[in-house]
Structure formats: structure tokens, C-alpha cells
Amino acid sequence: MKQVLQIRCKNNKKTLEVPIGSTLYEVYRAFNLKMDFGPVSAKVNNKVEGMNYQVFQNKDVEFLDLHSASGVRTYTRSLFMVLCKAVHDLYPKSKVVIDIPVSNGYYCNISIGHTVTENDATRIRQQMQSIIDRALPIRHYEATTEQALNMFRELGDEAKVKLLENMGSLYTTYYKLDDYVDYYYGSMLTNTSQIKLFGVEKFFDGLLLRVPSAENPAKLDDFINQGKMFEVFRVHHRWQEILGVRTVGDFNEAVKQGFANDLINVSEALQEKKISQMAETIANKEGVRVVLIAGPSSSGKTTFCKRLSVQLLTCGVKPVQISLDDYFVNRIDTPKDETGEYDYENLYALNIPLINEQFTALFQGKEVQLPSYNFQTGMSEMKGKKLRLKPNNVLIVEGIHALNPMLTKDIADEKKFRIYASALTTILLDDHNYIPTTDNRLIRRIVRDYKYRGCSAQDTIRRWPSVRAGEKKWIFPYQENADAMFNTAMLYEVAVLKAQAEAVLEQVPEKCDEYAEAYRLRKFLSYFASLPFRSLPPTSLLREFLGGSSFKY
């Protein structure tokens, strides 16, 4: 008699019996599900697995397609492998580095003995399409870590060797596409034919690889020129090359050799130098009366504002900070979102006419009565402090809409200095596994929310997609308006956040939907050596999340 087990499918809320050892693909077909953009992977007991995963016990299963962030990650990783194989096929002695998430794509540094040309981009794109058209299986293997290390040593992949050496895992998974072998952090597609849409084009001196978005998997994300952000990444990468710490494996090796404090001190000094240079630029730029600072959640904007204010004072400029929260319109006039809830992230939740009227008056030397928003009554009250700017004063305005031209539409551009601040993670796991900048910020937020706001990691993870949607709508479209960009990420920070983040993430129960993301983040953290945060200076930006800052928040 054939042995069977029970599978509960979250997609259609049905339960079926399937043979023991069935793959997720076989389970999917048994449920007779239809997904236009999938399945690409599945959550098995709230843990993401590839579709070739076999089930040997009763499980809860939720199949994922390209409408999910996890599904897009699986698709993107698989496309990275196709790209790496295509380049390897055409240029056997080449090197590919998946380097920078930028311009709604991924910048790839391709070393092929000469600068990448349009013809190279065309050849690589055609070779990728050929690999996809051949419907090649992407096979999943498991070996002892020692065997995997020997294999990658023979392949000359030192970045992977360094990464795996420091993990301490007994076994390691890897993937094979035809004759090409690689390691990827997370689930993969099972066949290249599942890749329906991608773009490859020459970008600066490399390639830009483009993928569909979860919002609309039927089309590629529109190209956005993010030259300023690209340059920020490039500057940090050059600095990391000088230090010899380009990947997590390099970092772990440096920690093992006793250079942790050096990495912390240099990272902090670099940030302070950038802030000092920015303050000097503001002080020396004639006519600047307001500094506008925007950036996504958990970028460390509050500490950045305080450190910038200190440096401005050393330049003879006295900053005056104004909170945009005090410019909220009355709650009854606040726009609502698609669910009917008040949308406080909407630009028009702010009293734009009053902002422009008062800023104009201040720059003319007039005294104004600032508003004060009463969060209990939901009313704007003219009970704030009275303010008149002196000649050496400059306003500091921080908020999600600070770079939106509509916020200060009546203020002349020469009076503004705009800064975009975000945690732009520049260290790589290895050459083919980049670190999403959103992971850095989410880990910061999980630690801060638990420590200071009484929120569990489960709550923070649950709200994160809504936070990201607001950023995509209100912040990212205006980031290239900035006169300067400041990278708040630091080379060592994940290692310092690790202990506190792991402790909070381990509290997320397996039975909840957020467990999949918590598990993914725990796996990500496992790649890093752990560092104590005692040696951080009291002005460190990370103190905003970890505590112990000399600034008052």
C-alpha cells in the first residue's frame, strides 16, 4: 500500500493526500492550482523552499509567484545564475560581480579583458536567451562544507571560499546549471524556461540587469537614471578595495585577525569626514537658508541631522530644526488611502501653503508663530514657538517629503540644499550574492522597534511592506533631486546588530506568516561574525538603534 501524507494548501484552503516524497511541483499539480506568474517557490511550514523540495511529513504549503517579494527574489537569483553562465560560456576567463542595485536593476561588473561594449551586451543577452530557450534544469545539490570548499577552491572562487569557511555549517547547498556550478543564498527556480522576462543593457562600464517587479510581473520596471546614487556606491566600493574588505568573507577574516576596531574606527571617521565636507559646502554656498533632508525608514536621518548640525556650528552656521509633523492638516482634512484609513504619509497630509508662507516670511527676516499639531485631538494649533531667523541661521527640515519639489514650491532653489540619506549597503556576501539595502534597514528597524517602541519582530515584519510602498511612492522618485547623498550604512554594522537582531527574530513563532522572513533574516545574519557594540563612539549613527547615544532623541 502506497504511503501518503496530508498537505494543507493556504492558496485554496484545501487539504489533500499525496504520496510521501512528492515534490512541491507534484503537490501543486495535485491541487490543480493556476498561477499566471508561478509557482516559483513555496512556503513550507512558513519556510521558503524551491519547487523540487520533497515532502516526507504532513505540511502546510503556500505557493508563491512573482506577485510576492520572495518570489521575485527567487526569480532574480536564478537570472543571476543564467547571466553568470552566459558570460562564462562566452568569456571563459571572465569574472562577474553582481554589484549594485540601482536604476531599477542590478549593475554587474564584468571583467572580460576589455571594457564592456554594446556588442558584448548584445552577445551576453543572446546567450542568456539561448540558455533559457534550452529549458535547462537548475539542479540543487548538498555536500559537506569541506567538499563544497574544495570545489570552489578548484574553481578559483575565493570570495565563496572565505564566506563558507566562516559559517561553521556541516553541510552546504549549491546549484548546477549545465556545466556551471555556483552557490546562492536562497531558493532557485528549477528550470531556465521559467524565466520569461529580463533585460540586459550596457550601463557605465558594465551591464544593467533588469527584472520584473512584484507590482507588475508582466513588464520590466522602468529604467530610472540614478547616476548620483551609482556614484555613491562606486566611491564606497573604491574605499573598500583599499581596505581589502569587499565581501563578508573578507570582513570575517579581518575580524578573525583582530582588525575589528580598526574597521569600526575607519567607518566612523569616513562618515564624520563626509558630514564635515557637507557642512562646509552648505556654509560656503551663498544664499542657502534651508537644508532639506529625506530618506527611507531606518536610514538614521535623526542622528545624521544632529551630527550635521554640530558640523554646521563649527562652520559658523547656527542650525534651527523644524518638525514637519507640526504642519499636519487637521485630521478631518487628511487624505485617505485605498482602505479608507487616514494616510499620514501623503504629501497633502501636510499644510503645503502654510509651509511655503512661513518659510518665505522667515527668509525675509520676519517673525512667525510656528504651528503645533495636537495628535490627541487631531487639530493643528498655532501654539508653537515664535521664530525669527538671524543672518547666520539655517533651517534644518527632515521628513519623507523633504525632496519633493511641491513641499517648498514657492522657495527659490538657490535657498535650498537638498540631502538624500539612506543605508546603501556596499559590502557583498560574495561576487554573485549582493545584499539588498532594504535588509540593512529592516534589521535596524526590528532592533529599534523592539528596544524603544515595544514592537515584536513579527509586528515590524508585518508592517514593512506598507512602509516600503510608502517609500516607493513618496521618497524614491525624488532622490536624484538631491544636491548631496549621504550613505548611512557602515561596513561593520550588521556584525554589531547581529546579536540583538537574532534574539528578537528567534521570538517569531513558526506558525505565523512572518516566520518566513524572520528565518531568511536569521540565515542572512549567520554569514557575519558577531561584534559587541561597546566600542562604538557615543555619536555613532548606530546608537540611534542600539542605544547609548550622547544625542537626545
Describe the function of each predicted region.
Residues 301:
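Conserved lysine of the Walker
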